[in-house]
Amino acid sequence: MKDKAPVSSQQDHFSRGGAVGGKPISDVRGTSRPFYRKPVSHNTIAELAEGFRVLSNGQKTISIPMKEVSALMASVGLHLSDEEFHEVMRVFGQGEQTNTEELSFKDFLSLMMCEVDDTMLEEMRGAFLHYDKQKTGFVTKKQFTELFATGGECSTPEEVEELLTIAEQDETDDKIDYNRFINELIHRLNFM
């Protein structure tokens, strides 16, 4: 029997079954394919550079304090503890930074342009698998609401309602296809 050639793309990782916590995920209904942003225009980079200048209080600088990034997140309703903030930076690809006190413009661009990768997909799916022990790809509306209202960064009732709108649950049996939800969420995040 011939060995299969290794798959070099991320796109089929979850359709073949990924892993959460070192344990394989068996195939569930729906597949996940990463969505990639379109090429970044000069105007987009200019807008991000302006945002970076605002965070640096108008100074032309090569880095900004992480506390400014954390304050920005808090100003838009993302109130994170220091530990949670550092975890967000790690998940969004900033874990390899040597300077954890400042964010360079290059790292700022990476953060703003970050795409959802397999690690993030595994973490999202892992959260749903807590409720989906049978690995059907579905959770109830109650489980979905509980996950976002009580887990990790607790969502407000309004935010949960918005997430439910994105989830488009099946009205007949009150189930939510979390693979479809994750795909839609990824699409929205990657094309913001």
Curated annotation (Swiss-Prot):
Give the InterPro entries listed for this entry: CALM/Myosin/TropC-like (IPR050230), EF-hand-dom_pair (IPR011992), EF_hand_dom (IPR002048)
The GO cellular component terms are:
myosin II complex
Indicate yes or no for the key word Cytoplasm. no
Binding positions for Ca(2+) 1 per the UniProt entry = T100, E102, D107
Q: Where is this region: Disordered?
A: 1-36
Q: Identify the keywords attached in UniProt to this record, alphabetized.
A: Calcium, Metal-binding, Repeat
- What residues does Ca(2+) 2 bind to? D132, T136
Q: Which GO terms describe its molecular function?
A: calcium ion binding
Kindly indicate whether the keyword Metal-binding belongs to this entry.
yes
Which intervals hold domain EF-hand? 46-80, 81-118, 119-154, 155-190
Coiled-coil regions listed: none
Gene3D superfamilies tied to this protein: EF-hand (1.10.238.10)
Q: Which PANTHER family does the protein's record reference?
A: CALMODULIN LIKE 3 (PTHR23048:SF0), MYOSIN LIGHT CHAIN 1, 3 (PTHR23048)
Q: What is known of its domains?
A: This protein has four EF-hand domains, two of which may be functional calcium-binding sites.
Q: What is this protein called?
A: EF-hand protein 5
> Could you tell me which species this protein originates from?
Trypanosoma brucei brucei
